[in-house]
Swiss-Prot record:
GO terms for molecular function: identical protein binding. Changing residue 130 to Y: In strain: Nonneuroinvasive mutant HF10. Pfam families: Herpes_gE, Herpes_gE_N. Phosphorylated on serines within the acidic cluster. Phosphorylation determines whether endocytosed viral gE traffics to the trans-Golgi network or recycles to the cell membrane. N-glycosylated, and sulfated. This is Envelope glycoprotein E. The chain crosses the membrane at residues 420-440.
């Protein structure tokens, strides 16, 4: 029998038989040296045709320790299942064959026609193995069929043979402490071998009844309890949900936040089982977790989250889900939240939904509980094993395993992308508006500068400002005495020797009664005195137009 046939046979035993309503596969653990009775045959059929009963075994002693998992078949029904690598299995070996209804025999029960193992026998319609050994571990099956028809498997059991426990020797008199008082010494002397009476161990003291006292709890923080099915098998097109139960118990009055995070890992068909390294859940950045040796079949670290439901402001009096909640989920076709709970709902499930799902509970950003569920079809099912130690580091740096999120080809934009687009658009609009205002101000200032420069060119009289009254009306008086009487009306004194280090600017001081043109149409020429960059021993006088620059 090739390996494919062996795997198909196992799946038929573990899955198809359960779906067809036949007895489920059971697990049994025994110790070396015991006599084991397995797989009782169906009772006598009376007038029915004679049936052939066949017991066989598929050895699993080369597959290492087996880890059964509880698989949900049409919840809440659960059965223990596992997937065994075909490379470690051997061909099925027949053990015994009998016929029913039984023919009378000297020992009673079924008359066994063939027995292929010296330690096997059929007693009271059951297969009995005398003095089991570790090599007897395997998958035992019972098949029933007519004489002319092929046999049909009706029951199976996985037998795991463990080493026998080491017997502890009975206590000796030396194991008991002797009293230090004189009476104890007399008793020990009286019980010496010389006296001929061996010393007997003291009788056990009767249990003392302590008065009941109220329990005092010193626990602080939050305790989280989680219950998850280890596996869920579905058929394409079904609608089902994860049956996860989470209970958070607060031991003090402090507020806390809780996040329920769902992760998904692909399960390659080349893997006989998936390994979940618990240490990597708490320390995902370790080198062993980033590049495990069995990377395709290991759930060690991740880069994204499938779904998150966050609770904030929770306390002892306001536990989840009563505290404020916020949910986020990647857009995956056929996947949604089950109402307002922490469970996932699969609608019209397809084989693409198969995988290893992890549910991790964070309290104040620290892991408090986690569980795993293998969700797949019967053909894609692989067992998941939790490993406590760190994985072995791979020789080459492999890409870390991470949850796979299958987004649709044209996924709608999320709210975060919409908000980012709105902010970017507003920023661009404000930038364009600011540039427009800056350009207008620059153009206006340039035009104003040209106008002022043209007025100062000296081509003709230019009046920057026309006042409605004479600016120097008080200075236009011919009476020098009047100016002397009012000190603050006196014109500024002219220095006789201006500084030779002047800035080059001309300070114009009026000396005429008025600086405005006369009404008869001609311009008045008034004497103006200029101070500036001339030599200190010389005073310059020049005539200027009747215009003043402010």
């Amino acid at each position: 029998m090739d390996r494919g046939a062996v795997v198909g046979f196992l799946l038929g035993v573990c899955v198809v038989s359960c779906l067809a309503g036949t007895p489920k596969t059971s697990w049994r653990r025994v110790s070396v040296g015991e006599d084991v009775s397995l797989l009782p045959a169906p009772g006598p059929t009376g007038r029915g045709p004679t049936q052939k009963l066949l017991w066989a075994v598929e050895p699993l002693d080369g597959c290492g320790p087996l880890h059964p998992s509880w698989v949900s078949l049409m919840p809440p029904k659960q059965v223990p299942e596992t997937v065994v690598d075909a490379a470690c299995m051997r061909a099925p070996v027949p053990l015994a064959m009998a016929y029913a209804p039984p023919a009378p025999s000297a020992t009673g029960g079924l008359r066994t026609d063939f027995v292929w193992q010296e330690r096997a026998a059929v007693v009271n319609r059951s297969l009995v193995i005398h003095g089991v050994r570790e090599t007897d571990s395997g998958l035992y099956t019972l098949s029933v069929g007519d004489i002319k028809d092929p046999a049909r498997q009706v029951a199976s059991v996985v037998l795991v043979v463990q080493p026998a426990p080491v017997p502890t020797p009975p206590p000796t008199p030396a194991d008991y402490d002797e009293d230090d008082n004189d009476e104890g010494e007399d008793e020990s002397l009286a019980g010496t071998p010389a006296s001929g009476t061996p010393r007997l161990p003291p009788p056990p003291a009767p249990p003392r009844s302590w008065p009941s006292a109220p329990e005092v709890s010193h626990v602080r923080g939050v305790t989280v309890r989680m219950e998850t099915p280890e596996a869920i098998l579905f058929s394409p097109g079904e609608t089902f949900s994860t049956n996860v139960s989470i209970h958070a118990i607060a031991h003090d009055d402090q507020t806390y936040s809780m996040d329920v995070v769902w992760l998904r890992f692909d399960v390659p068909t080349s893997c006989a089982e998936m390994r979940i390294y618990e240490s990597c859940l708490y320390h995902p950045q370790l080198p062993e977790c980033l590049s495990p040796a069995d990377a395709p079949c290991a759930a060690s670290t991740w880069t994204s989250r499938l779904a998150v439901r966050s609770y904030a402001g929770c306390s002892r009096t306001n536990p989840p889900p009563r505290c404020s909640a916020e949910a986020h989920m990647e857009p995956v076709p056929g996947l949604a939240w089950q109402a307002a709970s922490v469970n996932l709902e699969f609608r019209d499930a397809s084989p693409q939904h198969s995988g290893l799902y992890l549910c991790v509970v964070y309290v104040n950003d620290h892991i408090h509980a986690w569980g795993h569920i293998t969700i797949s079809t019967a053909a894609q099912y692989r067992n998941a094993v939790v490993e406590q130690p760190l994985p072995q580091r791979g020789a080459d740096l492999a890409e870390p395993t991470h949850p796979h999120v299958g987004a649709p080809p044209h996924a709608p934009p999320t709210h975060g992308a919409l908000r980012l687009g709105a902010v970017m658009g507003a920023a661009l609009l404000l930038s364009a508006l600011g540039l427009s205002v800056w350009a207008c101000m620059t153009c206006w200032r340039r035009r104003a500068w040209r106008a002022v420069k043209s007025r100062a060119s000296g081509k003709g009289p230019t009046y920057i400002r026309v006042a409605d009254s004479e600016l120097y009306a008080d200075w236009s008086s011919d009476s020098e005495g009047e100016r002397d009487q009012v000190p603050w009306l006196a014109p500024p004194e002219r220095p006789d020797s201006p500084s030779t280090n002047g800035s080059g600017f001309e300070i114009l001081s009026p000396t005429a009664p008025s600086v405005y043109p006369r009404s008869d149409g001609h311009q008045s020429r008034r004497q103006l005195t200029t101070f500036g960059s001339g030599r200190p021993d010389r005073r310059y006088s020049q005539a200027s137009d009747s215009s003043v620059f402010w």
